[in-house]
Each structure stands twice: as C-alpha cells, then as structure tokens.
Swiss-Prot record:
Lineage: Bacteria, Pseudomonadati, Pseudomonadota, Gammaproteobacteria, Enterobacterales
Stored NCBIfam families: PRK04966.1 (NF003438)
The protein, known as: UPF0270 protein SG2298
Family that this chain belongs to: Belongs to the UPF0270 family.
Gene3D superfamilies xref list: YehU-like (1.10.10.610)
Listed transmembrane segments: none
InterPro entries per the UniProt record, alphabetical: UPF0270, YehU-like_sf
Length: 73
C-alpha cells in the first residue's frame, strides 16, 4: 500500500529516508555524495512522485521504490 508522504511527520519522513539511504548501496559515480545530499535527492523524488513510500503488511515495514516498480498485491 502506498503511503502519502504528506501524511507523515517531516521528522519521521526524514528518518525513513535516511534509513533507506543508509541501507542502499547505490553507486553515485565518480564523486561520492554526502548523506545529506543523498537524503535530499530521495526526498525530492518522493515529493515529485517519482518514488513512493510503500507499506508491506507481510514484512510490517516501509520501503521506498520507484513508482513504476510498485505493484499492489
């Protein structure tokens, strides 16, 4: 289930995104980005609708994924 980011407390949203960034091993090319830059990039994607917050009832967890990859069960 997609969770609207606007309904999440801003501090909680930041913490969710930071946790996501820390567990993702994304390669940012030749120049590494700071944690704050990575969080800002993901936040921008969430706010623009490119990425969505998804609640998994099976795993009882929230994940962030590209909107195009989301498949409701």
């Amino acid at each position: 289930m997609i969770i609207p980011w606007q309904q999440i407390d801003p501090t909680t949203l930041y913490n969710l995104i930071e946790s996501f960034v820390l567990r993702e091993g994304t390669d940012y090319g030749l120049q590494e980005k700071s944690l704050q830059q990575k969080v800002a990039d993901v936040l921008r994607q969430v706010q623009s609708g490119e990425a969505v917050l998804v609640w998994s009832e099976l795993h009882e967890s929230i994940n962030i994924m590209p909107r195009g990859q989301y498949r409701p069960y």
